[in-house]
Amino acid sequence: MTIQQLIAIVRDASGLMVTDGFDIEQKDGCENIVTSSDVAVQDFLCQQLSLLMPSSGFLCEEKDRNDAQLHEYTWIIDPIDGTANYSRGIDQCAICVGLKHGEEMEMGVVYLPRTDEMFYAEKGKGAFCNGKSIHVSERAFNNGVLCTALPVYHKEYTDICSRIIIDAFHQCNDIRRFGACAPELCYLAMGRCELYFEYLLSPWDYAAASLILTEAGGIISSAQGCPLCLTEPSGVIAANNAANYRQLLDIVKRHS
């Protein structure tokens, strides 16, 4: 399996993200939705990747597909990260596919069809967008932009997150909320922002993008400062350099 094969499969899958005519269903509440495009993209990806790597497992957002513990190699898939954005015609929505080997990511692809930005990385080989090498910025915390969000699916954590975000806002330059984890981590990887925080995410939200970020020179961990769990939900913090990472981690720990 090569990164170029994976890129080709992801690009083909994007053809199933129709611009109109998709069905919308609620999953766990009015905030969490799934479209018929999510299901179609995931089914296509699983079928194609199973043909190329028959012995691999899958950890996917839709249909509760999870046999990651049974396989040496596991595909971690979010068919559309930012489904709410997708359903409203907002550009920040992405197909995310990562290949996990043991406890580490080996490949990651994040594709934003509406902006035609294909982010990808292989372990130890750098990070790229549309064939061009990308790298994090060198901006300091006080000149940095923080990408973040309130916990729309876990509103019981709203007060904690608000305190963290307000504290960080007083120390950084500005804040952005794009409504999709993977695109935001890729933006960090290419220098469009410098800081990232979310209180609780699923592994398919961040797995593929986490490799792209680290290969671009960034740092990412759980909200407690531990290595990311690639099979269970986790809080996530990330930054463009060690000093900014430590400052953001201190803010998160102070309010958690």
Where are these regions (language model features)?
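Oxyanion/phosphate-interacting regions
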Residues: 1-8, 163-169, 186-256
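Conserved beta-strand termini and adjacent loop/short-helix elements that scaffold enzyme active sites
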Residues: 27, 61, 178-180, 223
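Residue-level detector of anion-binding/catalytic polar loops
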Residues: 55-57, 174, 194, 219
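Active-site-adjacent structural elements in enzyme catalytic cores
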Residues: 51, 66-135, 211-214
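Short, Asp-centered acidic motifs that coordinate Mg2+ and/or phosphate
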Residues: 57, 107, 145, 194-195
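N-terminal subdomain of lithium-sensitive/metallo-dependent phosphomonoesterases centered on the IMPase/IPPase/PAP
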Residues: 1-80
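Residue-level signal for inorganic ion chemistry
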Residues: 17, 38, 49, 83, ...
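Acidic beta-strand-loop-alpha-helix segment within the catalytic core
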Residues: 98-185, 233-256
